[in-house]
A protein has these predicted regions:
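Hydrophobic core segments of alpha-helical transmembrane domains in multi-pass membrane transport
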Residues: 48-57, 98-124, 159-172, 188-202, ...
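Extracellular loop-to-transmembrane helix junctions
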Residues: 7, 36-64, 155-156
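Transmembrane helix-boundary motif of multi-pass solute transporters/channels
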Residues: 14-51, 229, 263-266, 281-283, ...
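Alpha-helical transmembrane segments and their lipid-water interface positions
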Residues: 59-63, 71, 75, 113, ...
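Membrane-embedded translocation segments of transport machinery
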Residues: 2-13, 180, 184-328
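Inter-helical loop and helix-membrane interface segments of multi-pass membrane transporters/permeases
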Residues: 3-7, 35-39, 69, 74-97, ...
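Hydrophobic alpha-helical transmembrane segments of multi-pass small-molecule transporters/permeases
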Residues: 15-22, 48-53, 65, 95-106, ...
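Membrane-interface "cap" regions at the ends of multi-pass membrane proteins
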Residues: 1-30, 59-64, 68-96, 273-277
Length: 328
């Protein structure tokens, strides 16, 4: 009987990009800017960095070590990994929470993925000529125009089915030919497109309202300069540092953005070799995520939103929402 050859990561670069891709997402580009605005602007970075150093990085290394250890016994999910470490029956039942966490994340991330695909397609055909068009398109996409509580959009379901099928196909390709291959392409493209969007957003010139500029470069839908958004986001309010809720929010953001306690890091790390360096590789993946969050995420959503909605329209919206609705 021939033994099945165990899959491994083909390269360290692929592993880092896959781990970063596991972490980079809504938390970076939508949740982080909203949390920063709500919790002191630029001053939010102080508890944020403290939480990253004291909680984020150590816990990432713990999860990497746990995953690698469990992988030596052939376990690639949290129940098996916990069972190999604890040696008591109840440990594997605690690991079930890791499975449920990933199931819940996948259930709503597929919807977000399908919405993003639909928005990209509509953007290519020039469907967002006005800010109001974006809201109407979202209502059409989720079926809320019907006026029913349990509205269903056929097009929304079609995009969802396509994204679900695409994800299943990638996973069926395995570790190196599926996840790692896509990560090597997708992560560089994500960073490139995010950088382009950030630069393009900062170049918006208002063509309407009291700040309108008479220029061919002016955007007739923009009413403010995007740099006002940067100032709004990063002007520090140090008084907020005395509020315990700000520190809790910073820790929560670190847990959310690094995917700590969700079981996915355990799974990825279980395919490491026994002598692989988890300290350097884990830190590299974490800092890649932080670059996407603080540098890129902090330069996209708020400046662009301020350019089209103004500070007065943004302030109330961002303080009453997490940033998801504003993003779409």
């Amino acid at each position: 009987m021939t033994a099945v050859k165990k899959e491994r990561w083909a390269s360290r670069v692929g592993l880092v990009l896959a781990m970063a891709g596991n972490a980079v997402g809504l938390g970076n580009f939508l949740r982080f800017p909203a949390q920063a605005v709500k919790n002191g602007g630029g001053a939010f970075l102080i508890p944020y960095i403290v939480a990253l150093i004291l909680l984020g990085l150590p816990l990432i290394w713990v999860e990497w070590a746990m995953g690698r250890y469990g992988g030596q016994f052939g376990h690639h999910s949290t129940p098996g990994i916990f069972d190999s470490i604890g040696k008591r029956p109840y440990w594997k039942y605690l690991g079930v929470f890791g499975l449920w966490a990933n199931l819940m994340i996948a259930s709503y991330y597929l919807y977000i993925e399908s919405w993003t695909l639909a928005y990209a397609g509509n953007s290519l055909i020039g469907g967002f000529s006005t800010p109001e068009a974006s809201g109407k398109f979202f209502e059409w996409l989720i079926g809320s125009q019907s006026g029913h509580v349990f509205a269903v959009s056929p097009w929304g379901l079609l995009f969802f089915a396509f994204c679900a099928g695409l994800n299943i196909f990638i996973l069926s390709r395995g570790l190196a030919k599926g996840i790692e291959f896509i990560a090597k392409i997708g992560m560089p493209l994500l960073i490139l497109f995010a950088a382009i969007l950030a630069v393009r957003g900062l170049m918006i010139v208002p063509g309407a309202g009291p700040q309108a500029v008479d220029s061919s470069w002016a955007d007739k839908q923009a009413i403010a300069w995007p740099t006002e958004g940067l100032a709004f986001l990063w002007t520090p309010n140090f008084d907020t540092l005395w509020n315990p809720k700000v520190w809790i929010a910073a820790a929560g953001q670190i847990f959310f953005t690094l995917s700590i306690g969700m079981g996915s890091i355990h799974c990825y790390a279980s395919y490491l070799r026994e002598n692989d360096d988890i300290t350097l590789t884990g830190a590299t993946a974490a800092w890649t995520n932080e670059f996407c969050e603080v540098i890129l995420g902090g330069t996209i959503l708020i400046p662009i939103a301020v350019a089209y909605y103004g500070l007065s329209g943004l302030d109330e919206t961002i303080r009453n929402n997490s940033g998801l609705g504003l993003g779409f």
